[in-house]
Amino acid sequence: MNQRLIIKTALSAAILASLAGCASQPAHEWNADTTYKLTVLHTNDHHGRFWQNKHGEYGMAARKTLIDDLRDEIQAEGGSVLLLSGGDINTGVPESDLQDAEPDFKGMSKIGYDAMALGNHEFDNPLDVLFKQQDWANFPMLSANIYDKKTGKRLFQPYAMFNKQGIKIAVIGLTTEDTAKLGNPEFIGQVDFRDPKVEAKELIAELKKTENPDLIFAVTHMGHYENGNRGINAPGDVALARYLNEGDLDMIVGGHSQEPVCMEGPNVIKKNFKPGDECQPDQQNGTYIVQAHEWGKYVGRADYEFRNGELSMVSYDLIPVNLKKKINVDGQSQRVFVQDEITQDKAMLDFLRPFQEKGQSQLNVKIAESNGKLEGDRDVVRFQQTNLGRLIATAHMERAKADFAVMNSGGVRDSIEAGDITYKDVLTVQPFGNMVSYVDMSGQEVLDYLNIVATKPVDSGAYAQFAGISMRIENDKVTNVFIGNKQLRLDGRYRFTVPSYNASGGDGYPKIDTHPGYVNTGFTDAEVLKDYLESHSPIDVNEYAPSGEVMYQTNNVVNQ
């Protein structure tokens, strides 16, 4: 028999076998007219919080107890559980950061996560660290839209399949394409972050042909934006659901925007959600969208019923993990649990404690003190000039002997409370390990730069904090610029500092690290801040309070 006949015969046999299989195999493994219970538990934006905070809130030991109890309860009632994470395990507290989030990924494995989305902060470290973290995790880290620029192939597993009582569930992973500007440019030069909406549509079509799932979920790190109003951010979960065919995704388990996704009505988010409140998830184009705030503060619980191929949500809840509220008792403020205290799992505590002790041994030494709060809260520092933003910029300016300083608010990760300041406080505020850099430019170049950087919108990490400069921003244009109390001269020469991350184009800033006047000092931002605090202690926070140096005017309304 010649080769062509062998191939033809083999193909004919394969086609007949395939047709016979289609005729004899059931289309599904579940039983008709039977109601199945399925619960999806989820967290997101963990950011290194493996240990409880100083008030005894959240932490992975309490989370494990809660999830173990929920699993036992659900399985006792005949249901099944899927545990998912919306990503950003990395970057947040020094005890985790100094150990490459080893306690966090290994802790997630012990809790029993089924899958997670890769978040943008997974790319704050070199790729070899991320690959090491994959080895620590006994669950898949998913992203369908991240490719190797050289090979054109996906860098990570795009989806995972799960079988729950005969129900075939495909879980696809998607990562914000903003990672290209939010990730450290030094580590992602060969990584291509493609449009997750397009990748999702193509992958869903492929899965329907190859895997024939009963349900398709997406675990994403793209952000939830009310009614899809995303500003300068890349498209998020709402845009994803609307882009796909209706009902292509049964559920999106999200992250990135770090909020409880609880709706008051269609396309209207509940603005003042408090722990213990009822939570109604978003629903767009036949897709449920959920997100559980941040740091393991909550475990989201979505209870479904599956019957004859149809999925319906029975209930949804955000369960607080030992969150507390302040009350007044006999004229004094006390913190009490919002709900019953969740006992910390002893085995998990024993596992995590050595990591916590190792980290703390390096961090809890006092380096300075202050007479008030240095403001770095996300919902403040991304909207207005603050004393902490100005202090950090001043520290950079002093180290580089610069005329003024630019500091992206996304690099200010927390506040520093009044009183003693430790190295841990510094690393919590600046965990990324960016270098302080500076550039010498002409006045015209400076003005061109400011017209891009100083006009970045609020509510984004690109919003800039400044020191050593005053200006007015109106209609996306910078005017009345003074540097060192002298008006900007277009033919003058000026030096300013900027984090190396932004100098490389991060946050959409102009890429200036190839400018002939650019210098990377080699000093990490946290080290510079630590040295500045030590040498200027005690810190008078009032000296750094903004007093109208940077004025924004929009629709005749002036903001600082």
Curated annotation (Swiss-Prot):
Gene3D superfamilies: 3.60.21.10, 5'-Nucleotidase, C-terminal domain
Keyword Magnesium in annotation: yes
Signal sequence coordinates: 1-21
Positions where lipid (S-diacylglycerol cysteine) attaches: 22
A biological process term (GO) from this entry: nucleotide catabolic process
GO CC term (a single one): outer membrane-bounded periplasmic space
Sites annotated Transition state stabilizer: 121, 124
GO molecular function: 5'-nucleotidase activity; metal ion binding; nucleotide binding; UDP-sugar diphosphatase activity
Positions contributing to substrate binding: 432, 501-507
Substrates-to-products reaction catalysed: a ribonucleoside 5'-phosphate + H2O = a ribonucleoside + phosphate
Protein name: 5'-nucleotidase
Organism per entry: Vibrio parahaemolyticus serotype O3:K6 (strain RIMD 2210633)
